[in-house]
Design a protein with these regions (language model features):
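Conserved NTP-donor binding/palm subdomain of two-metal-ion nucleotidyltransferases/polymerases, i.e.
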Residues: 1-266
Length: 266
């Protein structure tokens, strides 16, 4: 459904129970991809394999007014505050890199935009899990503006910032989940074999991850308590991405931990 809605990639939909269809829409809400699901349903409305129960019809009707943002509108959303890396040294490198590029005579706006999308996805992945919205928007950007990106320069930036493998993971998801060709993603060094598994895990667990906030509370006796289950879940998620960039992964975890401490509720 998402492939059809986001990239016009039509294929026959396998029959699913009403429960699974409802679950798909719930995941779409959590992942912020309802506009693409809605368009996917529209493209498959004559598919005989898609059996509409009354409850499914009501759900499809409920999301039918979702509008797909333009690529430029999405870029504006994620760059209202420039995406940053968490690690201090990487953040400083990124600041210098951006300043140098903006002052360059051959400044490439599209290459900076591509970098912003990648960094935004890195932040989402390390703090919440893989974002299908971010991956889809990366794919849309590549197919609409990729010809204007200086991929040689982009690869150099990714290497300098130490996020080459995290970027390759994003590209691998485009290949595994959305059937992109590798030649559409020039910045990829290699396909990450765990891409599909990590995506499935994020889809399964993100609803639970976002249902409970990870924060500390002040008890009446002055002691501070934390939801240990959510803490362990965040720690396990961080461990899954250690191989891709241990420094940024640890920095992201500690930043989220510190933020939780700063928001202690009484």
């Amino acid at each position: 459904m998402l492939r059809a809605g986001a990239f016009d990639d039509y294929e026959v939909v396998e029959p699913m129970s009403a429960f699974k269809w409802k679950r798909l829409i719930q995941i779409g809400e959590v992942q912020h991809v309802l506009p693409y699901l809605s368009r996917g349903f529209s493209k498959h409305e004559d598919d005989r394999q898609l059996t509409y129960t009354e409850s499914l019809r009501q759900e499809v009707e409920r999301i039918s007014d979702q509008q797909i943002p333009s690529v430029d509108a999405y870029l504006l959303t994620i760059t209202q505050e420039e995406p940053q890396l968490t690690n201090f040294l990487s953040k400083r490198k990124l600041k210098k890199l951006r300043k140098r590029e903006l002052n360059s005579e051959d400044c490439s706006e599209e290459t900076l935009q591509m970098l912003n999308i990648i960094i935004h996805n890195v932040n989402q992945t390390l703090s919440k899990g893989i974002s299908l919205q971010g991956i889809i928007e990366m794919g849309r950007f590549l197919r609409t503006k990729g010809d204007k990106v200086d991929f040689v320069k982009l690869e150099q930036w990714l290497h300098q910032l130490g996020i080459t493998r995290l970027a390759s993971l994003q590209g691998s998801i485009l290949i595994e989940v959305f059937h992109f060709d590798m030649n559409e993603i020039p910045f990829m060094q290699k396909e990450e074999k765990a891409a599909s598994k990590l995506t499935q895990r994020s889809l399964t667990h993100m609803a639970a991850d976002t249902a409970e906030n990870w924060h500390f509370r002040m008890r009446t006796n002055g002691m501070v308590e934390n939801n240990s289950r959510v803490l362990r879940r965040n720690l396990r998620r961080s461990m899954r991405y250690m191989r891709y960039n241990p420094v940024e992964t640890i920095s992201s975890f500690m930043a989220n931990f510190a933020k939780s401490l700063s928001e202690i509720e009484e």
